[in-house]
Amino acid sequence: MDRGRPAGSPLSASAEPAPLAAAIRDSRPGRTGPGPAGPGGGSRSGSGRPAAANAARERSRVQTLRHAFLELQRTLPSVPPDTKLSKLDVLLLATTYIAHLTRSLQDDAEAPADAGLGALRGDGYLHPVKKWPMRSRLYIGATGQFLKHSVSGEKTNHDNTPTDSQP
């Protein structure tokens, strides 16, 4: 089987295309003689460069993503700086914080004379989380509340709010 093609490709399923593939390989410009060619043989003088470039690009992408998650974690007000969180933990806390801010803005719009500006209303959001085996249980209630409130809030808000979308 040719290592350059997937196992399910039509050319690897029959025996006839093998001579055709060999003829195409041998007719490439720059080929001077018989010998193994393609990914399985021949000299590998230039084949390491694309792999190294791909690896460097992937390392850069992962590093950028890691820095973005750390920055997002730093913006969460209830998470102490020494807390180790997984990416899922950071995303869940960020979504619950955004939901809390959204609900606070909606509550402020409904009752602007409310004296408790910025006070947390105790809805189960913004848990300070340390690494411990049962930390996932913290999110079960918070995300469930978030999903229930956001879905019901969207249904009622679509009927009551004006369609002006500019801030």
Swiss-Prot record:
One of its GO terms (cellular component) is nucleus. Residues 1-23, 46-55 have a biased composition (Low complexity). GO terms for biological process: developmental process; regulation of transcription by RNA polymerase II. Residues 1-60 are annotated as: Disordered. Transmembrane segments: none annotated. Keywords: DNA-binding, Nucleus, Transcription, Transcription regulation. CDD domains: bHLH_TS_TCF24. Residues 49-101 form the bHLH domain. GO terms for molecular function: DNA-binding transcription factor activity, RNA polymerase II-specific; protein dimerization activity; RNA polymerase II transcription regulatory region sequence-specific DNA binding. Residues 32-45 have a biased composition (Gly residues). Pfam families: HLH (PF00010). It is found in: Nucleus. Efficient DNA binding requires dimerization with another bHLH protein. Putative transcription factor. This is Transcription factor 24. The lineage of its organism: Eukaryota, Metazoa, Chordata, Craniata, Vertebrata. The gene is TCF24.
